[in-house]
Amino acid sequence: MNRLLDRLTQNGKFHPMWIVLAVTGVLIVASIVFIPARYEGSKEPKQKIAVADHAAAETLPEPDAGQHESKPEPAVIQTTHFTPPAERDMPTGEMGDMIKLGRNIFVHTQVYAKNLVGNGLNCVNCHLDAGRKADSAPLWGAYVMFPAYRSKNHKVNSFEDRLAGCFRFSLNGTPPAYNSKEMLALTSYSYWLATGAPTGKELAGRGYPKLDKPPRQPDAQRGAAVFEKNCAICHGADGLGTKVNAQYAFPPLWGKDSFNAGAGMHSVKNAAAFIKANMPLGKGNSLSVQEAWDVAQFVDSHDRPPDPRVKK
C-alpha cells in the first residue's frame, strides 16, 4: 500500500486511483461502524419481544380459566361404607320377635302377608339376601335416608310411605295400615339392619348402582338372545317364573304375577342397573353393559298388570 501511495504522489498530479482509494476507505469505515450497530439493533427487538411475551404469559389467563371460574366443579357425593349386623346378633325379647317377624314378612311375603299381595312376588325378589345385599336396594341403605322428597309422588315421604309404595306397585297389592303389625315389623327389621349407620348419609351400595349408557340403543331382539342364554334357566323360557310347591322359587318377570307398570323395576334404566349388578343370580357383573340394557328392554317389552294410578 505504501509503494502505491509513493507512485501516486511522485508527480504531484491528480490520479484516478485516488477516487478508488477514497471510496474504499469510506466503505471500510462505514462497515466498522454499521456492522456492530446492526448487530446490536438486531438483538434489541428480540429482547423486547421476549420480555413482552413473558409479561403476557404472566398476565393473560390460561385457556378456559374463565370457564373454570364461572362453572365450578359439581359436588361429589361422598359415600360411607357400611356392613349390616349379622343375623346371629339379632336381639331377643319382644323387640327381637318384632324384628324376626319383619324379616319373615320380607323374605316370605306370600306366607306372612299374603292378604296384602296381589301377585306372586316376595320383597326379597328385588332386595336380595333378605334386604342385606349392597347394590340391590338394601333396606339399611334406604332406612337412613328417610324422610325424603320423592318425585314419584311429589311429596316428602316417610319410610312407611316408601314401604307402602312397594306393596302397591312392586307387589301389585294393598299397602299395610300404618299402625299394623306388618308395617311395624318391617320398619323394625329395617331399623335393626341399619344399626350403627349414620342418618342422612349416602351409604355405598344404597339402591342400584349407576349404570353407564350402552354403546348402542337398547334392543329387545338382542335382549331376547341374552335372556335365552342367561335367564331362562331360572325364570323359565316364557319368563313366567319357576314354581316349587305352588310358590315361585324364581319370580315371573312379566305377566299377571309380576310387578305392575307403576313399579320402579318397570323402568328400563332401573332394571338394567339391577341386572348388571346382580344377575344371573350369584354371577353379578358377568353381563356386559350392553347386554344388561338389552335384556332389560326385552323384559320391559312384555305385558304386565297396569299402574294403579292410571285411570282406565
Q: Which residue ranges define each predicted feature?
A:
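Post-cleavage N-terminal segment of exported redox proteins
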Residues: 2-103, 109, 147-220
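Surface-exposed patches in mature extracellular/periplasmic domains of secreted proteins
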Residues: 110-118, 174-181, 199-203, 283-289, ...
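Secretory-pathway/luminal and periplasmic proteins that interact with or process carbohydrate-rich
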Residues: 112-114, 130-136, 193-198, 233, ...
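Short sequence/structural segments immediately N-terminal
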Residues: 43-45, 89, 116-121, 132-133, ...
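Amphipathic alpha-helical interaction segments
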Residues: 121, 125, 181, 185-188, ...
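Extracytoplasmic electron-transfer domains, predominantly the class I c-type cytochrome c fold
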Residues: 96-101, 105, 133-176, 186, ...
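Detector for the c-type heme attachment site
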Residues: 124-133, 191, 234-241, 254, ...
